[in-house]
């Protein structure tokens, strides 16, 4: 479920960025004189503004709701972790007693 929500979250984020980039700014009236007239658009002269604004608000709401749900799911996950995920802790090593020094077989020192 977490992965599916993450995919939906990414799609909503990309759609939100796309919708924001497609909207005309407040000072976009100058573009009409250079051939970017509103009469040739899909929604007419004023129809796209309302549609784009509502879709942006809807996607922004979905973005915030899904981000809160993903954060809640992520904070409630239990750490099952494998031994490869926690490499900062040193491995337990077996410590043995050092071997006793060998007793000389002769009385002549080396």
Curated annotation (Swiss-Prot):
The lineage of its organism: Bacteria, Pseudomonadati, Pseudomonadota, Gammaproteobacteria, Enterobacterales. The gene is secG. GO terms for molecular function: protein transmembrane transporter activity; protein-transporting ATPase activity. It comes from the Bacteria. The chain crosses the membrane at residues 14-25, 51-66. Belongs to the SecG family. It is a multi-pass membrane protein. Residues 81-110 are annotated as: Disordered. The keyword Membrane applies. It comes from Escherichia coli (strain K12). PANTHER family: PROTEIN-EXPORT MEMBRANE PROTEIN SECG (PTHR34182:SF1). This is Protein-export membrane protein SecG. InterPro entries: SecG. GO terms for cellular component: cell envelope Sec protein transport complex; membrane; plasma membrane. GO terms for biological process: intracellular protein transmembrane transport; intracellular protein transport; protein insertion into membrane from inner side; protein secretion; protein transport by the Sec complex; SRP-dependent cotranslational protein targeting to membrane, translocation.
